[in-house]
Structures are given as C-alpha cells and as structure tokens.
C-alpha cells in the first residue's frame, strides 16, 4: 500500500522515519507551489489529510513559508513534534487548524491525537480538537463540522 513515509510504530516513543517525512514534505511543498503557479493564492489553500495524510498535512503546513487558509487533520498525530518549535514557519502561526479523532480509534490512538493537540496549544497555535464516538474513520457529524469549518475558512 502506498505511504508517505515508513511507520515504525504509532505509540509514544516510537522511532519516526525522519528522512521519509522530510522528503514527503518536500514533495508537498512542490505540489503547493504548482497550485500557486497556476493562480491559486496560498491563503486559499487548505492542506488536509486523514491518518498518515493528516500527519503530513500538519507537518508540511506548519513549516510552509507562506500563510495558508487552514489545516485539516483527521485521526492523526503530529510527526517529529520535538522539532516543531525550532522549524515552524511564522507565516502559519495563526493558520486555523481543525483536528478530529475517534474515541475508539485502534489505529492511531486518541491519546496521540490529543498529545499532538496539546503540543500545538502549548506553542500557541490556533487549533481545535474534536472527538467523535467512532474508530479510525469519519462520521456524519464530523463531516458537518468539517463543512462548516471549511466554509468559514473559504468564505472570503
């Protein structure tokens, strides 16, 4: 199955594929730049993803040098969180972040999502964390909440 990077484990203290994460972020930087080159301003771009894709959305957007419209990260965690304070882009310090997680997620533990949320709050990011009574999936209420959040970000 294709993946953004190798996952060695999804528990606290698991080894992370730093080189793979950084390489995937560079690919996303290039993809964002292609969108900008095609006429879409950075402040109209939202990076979004589920699970490992959500991890890459968080990692990449928080380091991207131009302000984005938002970050949507579902059933995920913040990879290489210990580097964020040093590597973060000032451009996306105020970028709204929507995180959501299932209370019954048996793939990415809800505690990892909550830990990531707390890391972001500690660094004064504009982040909200929503929990839902589901596993590693998306539910109808989550889709309603995502829709409202997206409409708020892109109404301008």
Regions from the language model: what does each represent?
Residues 1-2, 61-65, 85-89, 112-115, ...:
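Short, glycine/charged-enriched secondary-structure capping and boundary segments
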Residues 1-44:
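Serine-hydrolase catalytic machinery in alpha/beta-hydrolase-like enzymes
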Residues 22-29, 33, 62, 144-147, ...:
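Amphipathic, non-transmembrane alpha-helical secondary structure
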Residues 41-92:
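Primarily recognizes the serine-hydrolase "nucleophile elbow" in alpha/beta-hydrolase
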Residues 92-97, 123-126:
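Short, proline-enriched alpha-helix->beta-strand connector loops that line the catalytic pocket
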Residues 98-101, 105:
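Short beta-strand/loop motif that positions the catalytic acidic residue
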Residues 111-156:
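C-terminal catalytic histidine-bearing segment of alpha/beta-hydrolase fold enzymes
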